[in-house]
Amino acid sequence: GETRVAKDWQELQGRAFELASGSSGREPFELDREPMALRERYGMNPLGQNLLLARRLVESGVGFVTVNGWTGPAPGETGGGPPSSSWDMHGGEMGMGNAFGTGSYGMGWCLPRLDEALSALMVDLDARGLLERTLVVCVGEFGRTPRINAQGANPGRQHWPACYSAILAGGGIRGGAVYGQSDKIGASVKDKPVRPQDLGATIYHSLGVPLDLQVGKDGFTRAISSGQPLLSLFG
């Protein structure tokens, strides 16, 4: 007969097919249902519209949404690098232009799009009563070198995992809090270091997942997290 694992797999497969093929699964992706003024508030570019889509997915009951930080061009707008290269601000020797300018790899291009889209998401979630039960995490996998690696027309910075920042909002996080501190050039952590597992534990805490939850079988059982949640961030 069928095992429990096989039955679970069939059930999940059926639910996934229903989600992908049914009208309830398609509707969140129909962004033209939104007022144009709201779409423009997010920004008529890939990042803005993807964050609007994320809100619609959350509103429809999706429990976990990941949005790539691609700051590509709006329709009819020139510029914008490929999706794999947003925020890849190495500078001239990588053929990516000035990391501090307004070109498609520059902070003058990327940051305004992020500011516009992320702030619109926060306001929109809050207005719909969704922010308190939705944790928003904005983070990359590393920072950038504190010292500029190239001079001249196209300066930039290399990868720097030793010190960087993340933004958390909603999900019980109290607004306006700052946790930790770097030195004055952002080279190293000066106060309250946070490890990746601590960030993970903080996310689990926000979602109500017990940190002593055991996962894995057949000799590989382990706690779901080895980190410590940053409890002072919660109001």
Where are these regions (language model features)?
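Ligand-binding pockets and gating/stacking loops
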Residues: G1-G235
